[in-house]
Regions:
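Conserved ABC ATPase "signature" region
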Residues: 1-18, 69, 117
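Conserved catalytic motifs of ABC-family nucleotide-binding domains
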Residues: 43
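Conserved ABC ATPase signature
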Residues: 22-26, 30
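Catalytic Walker B motif of ABC-type/P-loop ATPase nucleotide-binding domains
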Residues: 47-51
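Hydrophobic anchor residue at the start of the ABC signature
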Residues: 36
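Helical segment within the ABC ATPase nucleotide-binding domain
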Residues: 62-74
């Protein structure tokens, strides 16, 4: 059964022309897709993505955002840690901003993007979601 699931995940996440490539030969976006596919082999209810938008080009960011939305629609919870706030807030239902090791603020993307304290301490005064 795992072999069938693994094969399906490879088909869903990895383009056929790179399936036999070694990990070091993959681009950043291709590596992220592979990391996500690997995390799904155990059929989890939640996955953790650590810095999924770091070091990838804008097209790959959109691709990974689409994958995350697909996972959400399949009722797979996704916990993201990332410093790329704009990319992360644009796809989250609820977010937590940490400051000095503590939760500074939590809420919807719109709430956080408009919160004066969040802007002053973390996001920057000119931060906007659009």
């Amino acid at each position: 059964m795992k072999k069938i699931l693994t094969s399906k995940l490879l088909t869903d996440f990895i383009e056929s022309h790179i399936r036999n490539n070694k990990g070091f030969a993959l681009s950043g976006g291709e590596r992220r897709r592979l990391e996500i596919a690997r995390s799904l082999v155990t059929d989890p209810s939640f996955i953790l993505l650590d810095e999924p938008f770091a070091g990838i080009d804008p097209i790959a960011v959109e691709d990974i955002q689409g994958i995350i939305n697909t996972l959400k629609n399949k009722n797979i919870g996704v916990l993201i840690t990332d410093h790329n706030v704009r990319e992360t807030l644009s796809i989250t239902d609820r977010s937590y901003l940490l400051f000095n090791g503590q939760i500074l603020k939590s809420g919807t993307s719109e709430f956080l993007a408009n919160d004066k304290e969040a802007k002053r301490l973390y996001l920057g005064e000119k931060f906007r979601l659009d």
